Regions:
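Tandem CBS (Cystathionine beta-synthase) repeat/Bateman regulatory domains
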Residues: 1-145
Length: 145
């Protein structure tokens, strides 16, 4: 089975072909209150989403877990803090990303530990995401041939 993958041209696939474009990706912006971020996360069904600025530059990632951890008090969730804190106060800044011209094998390796990888253009502007699901679906198609 591994030999089949090695002999195929799967590694020649461009990640742009598997990418979900930025206009279809749920995201929040710097300056948004945590309440807004939590609403976007809940409505989208995602556990984490990218954090962008007004120029579509990637700054980090916000997740339900980060938000809940930031409002967790000693005895209760301090829900009032959802409007007091901003996305940039709790976001994760070190996140996985690759350039749009990166190889499929690099994306595959990164997807092992991350459910999605942000894709940036040469100006480091956010252009979309590559999901672990789309990578696995492509591999599955090659294995079924």
């Amino acid at each position: 089975m591994l030999q089949k993958l090695k002999n195929s041209n799967i590694m020649d696939n461009e990640i742009k072909e598997l990418m979900i474009s930025a206009d279809k990706v749920a995201h929040v912006q710097l300056g948004n209150p945590l309440e807004h971020a939590l609403l976007v996360l809940i409505k989208s069904g995602y556990s984490a989403i990218p954090v962008l600025d007004s120029s579509y530059k990637l700054h980090g990632q916000i997740s339900k877990a980060l938000i809940l951890d930031s409002i967790l008090g000693l005895e209760r969730f301090e829900l009032e803090r959802l409007n007091e804190q901003r996305v940039e106060d709790v976001m994760e800044e070190k996140i996985p990303w690759i350039n749009k011209n990166s190889t499929f094998s690099r994306a595959l390796a990164m997807s092992i530990n991350h459910p999605f990888i942000c894709i940036l253009d040469d100006d480091r502007s956010f252009i979309g995401i590559l999901t672990r699901r789309s990578i696995l679906a492509l591999i599955n198609r090659y294995l079924q041939k």
